């Protein structure tokens, strides 16, 4: 199962007794704050959950898998998520389904 933003908003509606519009706005606002902070070049640290960090990747040689031709892969900035200790511990305790 994958949790979506809509499902998060529905859970907030139920747990916090918000109306659907307020819950959806809260979820959108939360993620927009993360997006804006990363776009401004800053990392995001969510205590007890994890960190969203920006990393600069250097340009490197690449290869077209269909033709085998060498092509350059340009330098770029990527977002990396590093789970926090509490999140890792909780996930490790959960039982795999199957």
Curated annotation (Swiss-Prot):
Residues 54-74 are annotated as: Disordered. It comes from the Bacteria. Keywords: DNA recombination, DNA-binding, Transcription, Transcription regulation, Translation regulation. One of its GO terms (cellular component) is cytosol. SMART domains: BHL. CDD domains: IHF_A (cd13835). It holds the Pfam family Bac_DNA_binding. One of its GO terms (biological process) is DNA recombination. GO terms for molecular function: DNA binding; structural constituent of chromatin. Belongs to the bacterial histone-like protein family. This protein is one of the two subunits of integration host factor, a specific DNA-binding protein that functions in genetic recombination as well as in transcriptional and translational control. Heterodimer of an alpha and a beta chain. This is Integration host factor subunit alpha. The gene is ihfA.
């Amino acid at each position: 199962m994958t949790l979506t933003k809509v499902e998060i908003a529905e859970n907030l509606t139920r747990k916090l007794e918000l109306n659907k519009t307020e819950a959806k706005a809260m979820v959108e606002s939360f993620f927009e704050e993360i997006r804006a902070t990363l776009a401004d070049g800053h990392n995001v640290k969510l205590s007890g959950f994890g960190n969203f960090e920006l990393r600069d990747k250097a340009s490197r040689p690449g290869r077209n898998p269909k033709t085998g031709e060498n092509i350059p892969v340009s330098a770029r900035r990527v977002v990396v998520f590093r789970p926090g200790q509490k999140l890792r511990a909780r996930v490790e305790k959960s039982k795999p389904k199957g």
